[in-house]
């Protein structure tokens, strides 16, 4: 299955985070790293973003139930 690359507006829509929050979390190694698409364009692997979202859900449920 081919990997899909998400651009920043899609990542913002998927995560609900702002641009600055995404880059701050990346700097703190709390968010998937972007990949270079050439020039100044970057993107994120859809699978990595989906895993990050799943991890947040799991952490929230573990914290609130445990």
Label every model-predicted segment.
Residues 28-34:
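Short, solvent-exposed alpha-helical "recognition" segments
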């Amino acid at each position: 299955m081919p990997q899909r690359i998400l651009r920043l507006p899609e990542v913002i829509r998927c995560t609900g985070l702002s641009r600055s929050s995404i880059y701050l979390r990346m700097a703190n190694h709390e968010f998937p790293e972007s990949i270079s698409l050439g020039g100044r364009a970057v993107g994120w692997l859809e699978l990595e973003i989906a895993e990050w979202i799943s991890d947040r859900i799991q952490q929230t449920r573990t914290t609130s139930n445990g």
